[in-house]
Amino acid sequence: MNKKINQKKYLEALNFAFKLHSKQFRKGTKIPYFFHLSAVSNHVIENGGHTDEAIAGLLHDAVEDQGGEKTLKLIKKKFGSKVAKIVEDCTDTKVIPKPPWFDRKKQYISDLKKKPQSSLLVSICDKTHNASCIINDYYRVGKKIWSRFSANKKQVFWYYESLGKCYYTNLKGHKVLKQNFKKLVTEMSRIIHY
């Protein structure tokens, strides 16, 4: 059962996220980045998320992509400490420039195991959308999709497979969400080894 969403607070976050990411696009595409944020937030709501989780879904990339610690402080001021904590938990770095890809991802997975359920929910919704986009883009553009990443395709697969194990072990409930993520990882394995 879905919890009631505070629409006024959500709309404020929607506008804030849109402004923050208005000049950003998905890697290798002309798709405005905001659509990813919206998809993640919608997925959170569809999986029973409450207002703070849904807002964190909209803002989950704001810190690492749009200003680091300064942006996190602004999120806390505008939307509260619960939202800021989830966003921080879903951020793989607050450091600009970003550390190397593998180091960030390895640390993210290690830290994710200790995170609260709200953060795990937003994270799996984010990574589900990312994995789905990778697979869809693979079928659209082929193997050149891997050039979009700071890692090779086997490292990308390692990351998603490791995330799946983390979600299965640490995210309570959400059986269908975890099964869907597992299916995406299986499909990713197939296209990587193709």
Labelled PLM ranges:
Residues 1-194:
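Active-site helical microenvironments for divalent-metal-assisted chemistry
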